[in-house]
Amino acid sequence: METTIGILGTGRMGVRLAQMFARNGQRVILGSRDLDRAHRIATGLALEMLTAGSYEAAANADVILPAMFLRDGLLETLEPLRHYFDNKVYIDISNPFNDTYTDFILPWDTSGAEQIQQQFPNARVVGAFKNVWWEVFDAPTFGEGVSDVFVVSDDAEAKAMVLNLVENTPFRYIDAGRLANARTIERMTLLSGELGQRYGYFPRMNYKLLGEPWTVGQRDRVAHLIASHPTT
């Protein structure tokens, strides 16, 4: 069964995500309050699976993905559409940046994802693409390393559905656990922006989790040294 994705917002992230999903074979409705703008963008992208529409048309899709800033009134914009969200998978890409991208407009003990889940308790919120800057979508591979996307949710079934939707897109997707982990991921994105600007990478940078298998019970190579000094 074909899944339609409704993207609300025609900024840099919304357009990149619409392009990515449409290229992946999903039907996408790019929703905007300015229909002429949405049609112009959809025509310019020239993708068979992409059409333009209103916010209402996008919100009526099987999966919704609002691409707006919290600081610009995301929650207020979505409030009149809340009846579309009941029992629907909502992909949250929001980061609660302030106007200067130097801090967040939310306190440490919450996240954009949690605020959305609180505002729309019947939506099945899945946080994803929070750690990805817009320019990375054009080429998600750095050298031989494919960029990671951290995916969080308290709804295991909704998370699995999103992971299935993105399976053939050009990123590696990491199951990053519960929705509250969005607090950490959003702040990691804030840090990556600062580091990227400091070292001249912004906005062409991303995270990648590196590691190698570790055998359970394998001894630490310096365990005997640590054990001989238990008080330090």
Identify what each model region corresponds to:
Residues 39, 60, 86-87, 122-125:
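A glycine-biased structural micro-motif
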Residues 1-44:
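NAD(P)+-binding Rossmann beta1-loop-alpha1 motif at the extreme N-terminus of oxidoreductases
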Residues 147-232:
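Active-site-lining helix/loop region of Rossmann-like oxidoreductase modules
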Residues 51, 124-128, 174-176:
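General beta-strand structural signal in soluble alpha/beta enzymes
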Residues 94-135, 139-141:
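Rossmann-fold NAD(P)-binding glycine/threonine-rich loop
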Residues 46-89, 93-100:
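Rossmann-like NAD(P)-binding element
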Residues 1-4, 87, 146:
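Phosphate-coordination loops involved in phosphoryl transfer and adenosine-cofactor binding
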